[in-house]
Regions:
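Regulatory alphaC helix of protein kinase catalytic domains
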Residues: 3, 7-8
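Short beta-strand micro-motifs within the conserved protein kinase catalytic domain, predominantly
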Residues: 20-32
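Conserved short submotifs of the Hanks-type protein kinase catalytic core
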Residues: 29-43
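Activation segment of protein kinase catalytic domains, centered on the conserved DFG
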Residues: 50-66
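Catalytic-loop of the protein kinase fold
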Residues: 75-93
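Activation segment/activation loop of eukaryotic-type protein kinase catalytic domains
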Residues: 89, 94-127, 134-138
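A conserved short helix/loop substructure at the end of the activation segment
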Residues: 213-223
């Protein structure tokens, strides 16, 4: 029932950069199936990888702006809506090349039910997770906030800009989360890792990312 409520709630979100949910249904082996608009170009990372290198910077910046607009919208709602699971797989690209934020609410419910201070977050997503969400006392659970969305979006921007996962220098996601918990952040890669973005834009982008990754949540920028 809670999932149904979340789906109905998300159906009320009307923004050009939020993947529309058209309805819910049931089918074999799936008691609840969500019907969404079709995103013809798949997820953002795969889409960028399929472009010619000179095309990528402008397209990447467009996608980032699309998702920032979506986050500004949902965080500004009354009450605010928090995504809680931002990474490149949850950004889809439609036939027109627009970035669409998807899969929030439902993923958050699943994680609330399963994740504690002693649990392990699945799918490699610890690389994107704000440290306040896993620096917990035994038995505590997490609660995502607009500030933790900002942190995760910063990690996602780094991935889209360099086409490499956050904390690429760490062997695995546990090492990445340990580093983040100690206040460490991804090492700045050489300028050529950002493709054709250009040195001046890389400098501006990195300064923004450092603000988005601030260890203290209140020091992170709003969308």
């Amino acid at each position: 029932k809670r999932i149904q409520r979340e789906v109905i709630s998300q159906m009320q979100i009307q923004h050009p950069n939020v993947l529309p949910i058209l309805g819910i249904t049931s089918c074999d082996n799936h008691p609840l199936a969500i019907v969404t608009s079709f995103a013809a170009n798949g997820n953002a990372l795969s889409y960028l990888l399929g472009l010619e290198p000179p095309e990528r910077p402008a397209v990447m910046i467009k996608i980032i702006c699309n998702i920032a607009s979506a986050l500004e919208y949902i965080h500004g709602m009354l009450p605010p809506i928090v995504h809680g699971d931002i990474h490149s797989w949850n950004i889809l690209i439609d036939a027109g090349g627009q970035g669409l934020l998807c899969d929030f609410g439902l993923s958050r419910i699943k994680h609330e039910q399963t994740r504690t201070a002693t649990g392990i977050f699945e799918g490699g997503k610890l690389r994107y997770l704000a440290p306040e969400l896993f620096l917990l006392q035994p038995g505590q659970s997490f609660r995502s906030t607009p500030a933790s969305d900002c942190y995760a979006f910063g990690m996602t921007i780094l991935e889209l800009a360099t086409l490499q996962k956050p904390f690429v220098e760490c062997q695995n996601q546990q090492a990445a989360s340990t580093a983040a918990g100690k206040g460490l952040r991804p090492e700045q890669p050489p300028a050529d890792a950002f493709g054709a973005l250009g040195d001046s834009k890389v400098t501006i982008l990195w300064r923004l990312l450092e603000e988005m990754w601030a260890h203290e949540p209140t020091n992170r920028p709003n969308m």
